[in-house]
């Protein structure tokens, strides 16, 4: 971004801080067909971006092929450890974690 410099006064460069109610990110499809979301990470999930990208790719591929993620959540297997992650954990329709600490620690 060569035209982006440090201004001497306030200008139009801003950021957005997003966080879900229970501080668990939402990685899911939306109600709009073909539109997928990776939101609510509070900015602390940047270090997980490669995994988030891979699990979103898996989710999108499955849903676009006809998988009903809402009734049968996609399972993502991590690349290196082969651990299974139930993507229903990050569903927009999940039950909120009432025991959440309300912080990035969950």
Task: Annotate each PLM feature.
Residues 16-21, 48:
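Active-site loop of classical SDR/Rossmann-like NAD(P)-dependent oxidoreductases
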Residues 1-16, 29-32:
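Flavin-binding catalytic cores
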Residues 31-106:
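C-terminal lid/capping helical subdomain adjacent to the catalytic/cofactor pocket in oxidative enzymes
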């Amino acid at each position: 971004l060569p035209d982006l410099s440090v201004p001497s006064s306030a200008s139009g460069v801003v950021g957005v801080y997003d966080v879900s109610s229970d501080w668990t990110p939402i990685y899911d499809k939306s109600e709009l067909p073909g539109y997928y979301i990776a939101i609510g990470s509070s900015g602390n999930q940047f270090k997980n971006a490669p995994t988030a990208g891979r699990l979103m790719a898996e989710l999108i591929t499955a849903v676009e092929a006809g998988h009903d993620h809402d009734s049968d959540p996609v399972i993502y297997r991590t690349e290196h450890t082969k651990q299974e992650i139930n993507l229903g954990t990050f569903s927009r329709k999940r039950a909120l974690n009432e025991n959440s600490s309300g912080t990035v620690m969950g």
